[in-house]
Amino acid sequence: MEKLEMIYEGKGKKMWSVKGHDDLLIAEFKDDLTAFNAEKKGSESGKGALNNKISTALFKLLKSKGIETALVDTINDTEQVVKKCKIIPLEVVVRNIATGSLSKRLAIKEGTVLPFTLVEFYYKDDALGDPLVNDEHCIIMDLVKSENDLDRLKHLGREINSILLPFFKEKGLKLVDFKIEFGVDKDGNILLADEISPDSCRFWDSVTNEKMDKDRFRQDLGSVKVAYEEVLRRILS
């Protein structure tokens, strides 16, 4: 499968058009690390390949449980073929344990187990700092077609969480929270898109609470690659 031109470059990936396949794209995972809306930047060799492998494994798991995804195939260490879809400009954040912006915003002690799964929407706009938005904001800004779409996103977020939470528990990891994105394909179907990796999730070791995700970069806690390698090892074990 031949790449043509790069049509988009984000913080963690490059997207390429594919020769002879207008309905497909190639997603290339980068080694770049960013935090605090790209105010902090770095890079760690091999990080992109690890995220590609982790995300592929988790998307395949979710697909086996009935979640429709944009993933078609992984073609090498850093690249995967995905269905072309229109990305909904919302980050869907699913939280099980308080930390990060939730703890800061509401003064909830870090590590507090939430009484139920919390689903939040953040508007994808770097210039605005990806602000938290509610259902009414989403409708006013035409980010989705209807309230039914928002209900669908919430349902999918909780359904994905219900699959991943026990999976990671068996692997000795707490799934603290995660960010997912969705797209709409040419037939109007909502698909899980982007990635699920330690770049977009918070994982804590079940025994020690050691952080094994991008918070290691955010908070200068040590090697990102070593932690991501351990996450991959546990996922595949």
From Swiss-Prot:
<dbReference type="InterPro" id="IPR033934">
    <property type="entry name" value="SAICAR_synt_PurC"/>
</dbReference>
<dbReference type="GO" id="GO:0009236">
    <property type="term" value="P:cobalamin biosynthetic process"/>
</dbReference>
<keyword id="KW-0658">Purine biosynthesis</keyword>
<dbReference type="GO" id="GO:0006189">
    <property type="term" value="P:'de novo' IMP biosynthetic process"/>
</dbReference>
<keyword id="KW-0547">Nucleotide-binding</keyword>
<keyword id="KW-0436">Ligase</keyword>
<dbReference type="InterPro" id="IPR028923">
    <property type="entry name" value="SAICAR_synt/ADE2_N"/>
</dbReference>
<protein>
    <recommendedName>
        <fullName>Phosphoribosylaminoimidazole-succinocarboxamide synthase</fullName>
        <ecNumber>6.3.2.6</ecNumber>
    </recommendedName>
</protein>
<dbReference type="GO" id="GO:0004639">
    <property type="term" value="F:phosphoribosylaminoimidazolesuccinocarboxamide synthase activity"/>
</dbReference>
<dbReference type="InterPro" id="IPR001636">
    <property type="entry name" value="SAICAR_synth"/>
</dbReference>
<keyword id="KW-0067">ATP-binding</keyword>
<dbReference type="InterPro" id="IPR050089">
    <property type="entry name" value="SAICAR_synthetase"/>
</dbReference>
<comment type="similarity">
    <text>Belongs to the SAICAR synthetase family.</text>
</comment>
<dbReference type="Pfam" id="PF01259">
    <property type="entry name" value="SAICAR_synt"/>
</dbReference>
<dbReference type="InterPro" id="IPR018236">
    <property type="entry name" value="SAICAR_synthetase_CS"/>
</dbReference>
<dbReference type="GO" id="GO:0005524">
    <property type="term" value="F:ATP binding"/>
</dbReference>
<comment type="pathway">
    <text>Purine metabolism; IMP biosynthesis via de novo pathway; 5-amino-1-(5-phospho-D-ribosyl)imidazole-4-carboxamide from 5-amino-1-(5-phospho-D-ribosyl)imidazole-4-carboxylate: step 1/2.</text>
</comment>
